[in-house]
């Protein structure tokens, strides 16, 4: 279908799940097909992420407004993108990068660029009358990802005393994605009952997981395992656990301080070795601070052949940083967040680089989300087999899970559930 071009670009300011402004873009094509995309924002931001453009006017949304970005899209950027061929995603993304002209997208903002990039892809898929996952991945796109479900929130994602950001359940023993969500929902609601019985609060954090004040991390593991078993499931067989440590948030002066303890890098790695032995933990995300290169090499050497060691802040969806990690044996898995890099093309390139070098890939949301479900489609398109998109409460999280349930139905008998990581 040749010569379907971008006819109009319209941006507006909306609110994300934390009540902060973000961008929504609508692309209208020359055949009158249109599509919208909206952009998330993170609470824990890696030092090397592409830069969001914010207004920084403290009298307007406390400085978090995005009217500058919206105005740029509706004027300068839009004028240069209109009339480009919709089906040439790479050309459009390269044009957006060129318009910005910086190495970190700080002039027009990664949020501006990504909103356009994703909306273009959605419009192209609609033009061809196929789902986005099929447009991006073709007929080989058929693996439904195992969800890493953030069942208890801590760190910067919750107003409680837990140091680690996310305590996750991983339903690798399910027979289908639908089965995985059902099993996880049962554990989620059982966990709520257990927390109430122990007189912990059951308020939820930014990503929909419970946010109780539990002093000891090991008690959190014990409570989650209790919820799994009381739901009729077995650890290791049906569920295992994952952690997003976000170690950079408590790393200072070459020391790690949490739970009233101060650790050297070596001591922290020993701590991880101990809990991985004691508990069914099969995935550690950002267990080491992004600048602690020796620590990353150490933990990968000690645990990399046993569990998944995930780099988020270490890699920030950036091919250059991923290659550096591969060359230096740091981590064995890459977390992918499109807004860390700013275009769909760069996101897909980062995924391909990781997969080519046998690094596992996990598609991920951000703490400040919208109801946009693009990451669900990307996860299936690239057959990465894993997705992180929060807990089983808050509609912006469930939107992604519900979209994957829909994709599984579309794929019908072709659908394959990833299962074990």
From Swiss-Prot:
Name of encoding gene: eno
Reaction catalysed by this enzyme: (2R)-2-phosphoglycerate = phosphoenolpyruvate + H2O
Origin: domain of life: Bacteria
Short name of one Pfam family: Enolase_N
Catalytic site: 207 (proton donor), 337 (proton acceptor)
One of the GO biological process terms: glycolytic process
E.C. number(s) listed in UniProt: 4.2.1.11
SUPFAM superfamilies registered for this protein in UniProt: Enolase C-terminal domain-like (SSF51604), Enolase N-terminal domain-like (SSF54826)
Gene Ontology molecular function terms on file: magnesium ion binding; phosphopyruvate hydratase activity
Binding positions for (2R)-2-phosphoglycerate per the UniProt entry: 337, 366-367, 388
Entry-linked InterPro entries: Enolase, Enolase-like_C_sf, Enolase-like_N, Enolase_C, Enolase_CS, Enolase_N
Record's cofactor remark: Binds a second Mg(2+) ion via substrate during catalysis.
The protein's name in its UniProt record: Enolase
Cofactor entry: Mg(2+)
Alphabetized SMART domains for the sequence: Enolase_C (SM01192), Enolase_N (SM01193)
Functional pathway: Carbohydrate degradation; glycolysis; pyruvate from D-glyceraldehyde 3-phosphate: step 4/5
Described function: Catalyzes the reversible conversion of 2-phosphoglycerate (2-PG) into phosphoenolpyruvate (PEP). It is essential for the degradation of carbohydrates via glycolysis.
GO CC list: cell surface; extracellular region; phosphopyruvate hydratase complex
Keywords: Cytoplasm, Glycolysis, Lyase, Magnesium, Metal-binding, Secreted
Species this chain originates from: Ehrlichia ruminantium (strain Gardel)
Chief place where the protein resides: cytoplasm
Subcellular location: Cytoplasm; Secreted; Cell surface
Homology family: Belongs to the enolase family.
UniProt key word Metal-binding: yes
């Amino acid at each position: 279908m040749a010569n379907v071009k971008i006819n109009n670009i319209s941006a507006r300011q909306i609110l994300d799940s934390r009540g902060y402004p973000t961008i929504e873009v609508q692309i209208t094509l020359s055949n009158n097909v249109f599509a919208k995309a909206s952009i998330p924002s993170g609470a824990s931001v890696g030092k090397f992420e592409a830069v969001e453009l914010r207004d920084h006017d403290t009298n307007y949304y406390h400085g978090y407004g995005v009217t500058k970005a919206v105005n740029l899209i509706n004027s300068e950027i839009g004028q240069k993108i209109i009339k480009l061929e919709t089906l040439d995603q790479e050309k459009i993304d390269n044009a957006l990068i060129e318009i910005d002209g910086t190495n970190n997208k700080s002039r027009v903002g990664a949020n501006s660029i990504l909103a356009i990039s994703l909306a273009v892809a959605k419009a192209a898929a609609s033009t061809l009358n196929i789902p986005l996952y099929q447009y991006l991945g073709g007929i080989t796109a058929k693996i439904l990802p195992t969800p890493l479900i953030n069942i208890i929130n801590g760190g910067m994602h919750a107003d409680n005393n837990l140091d680690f950001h996310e305590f996750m359940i991983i339903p690798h023993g399910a027979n289908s994605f639908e089965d995985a969500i059902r099993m996880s929902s049962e554990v989620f609601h059982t966990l709520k009952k257990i927390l109430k019985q122990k007189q912990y609060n059951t308020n939820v954090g930014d990503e929909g997981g419970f946010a109780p004040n539990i002093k000891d991390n090991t008690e959190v593991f014990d409570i989650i395992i209790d919820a799994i078993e009381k739901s009729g499931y077995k650890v290791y067989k049906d569920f295992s656990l994952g952690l997003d440590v976000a170690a950079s948030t408590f790393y200072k002066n070459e020391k790690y301080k949490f739970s009233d303890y101060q650790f050297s890098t070596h001591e922290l790695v020993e701590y991880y070795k101990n809990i991985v032995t004691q508990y069914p933990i099969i995935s550690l995300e950002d267990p080491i601070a992004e600048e602690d290169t020796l620590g990353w090499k150490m933990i990968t050497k000690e645990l990399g052949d046993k569990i998944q060691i995930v780099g988020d802040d270490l890699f920030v969806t950036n091919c250059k940083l991923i290659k550096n990690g591969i060359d230096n044996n740091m981590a064995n898995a890459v977390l992918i967040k499109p807004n860390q890099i700013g275009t769909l093309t760069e996101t897909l390139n980062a995924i391909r680089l990781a997969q080519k070098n046998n690094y596992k890939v996990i598609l991920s949301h951000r703490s400040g989300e919208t109801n946009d479900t693009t990451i669900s489609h990307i996860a299936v398109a690239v057959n990465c087999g894993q997705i992180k998109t929060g807990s089983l409460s808050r509609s912006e999280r469930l939107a992604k899970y519900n979209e994957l349930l829909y994709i599984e139905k579309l794929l019908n008998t072709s659908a394959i559930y990833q299962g074990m990581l």
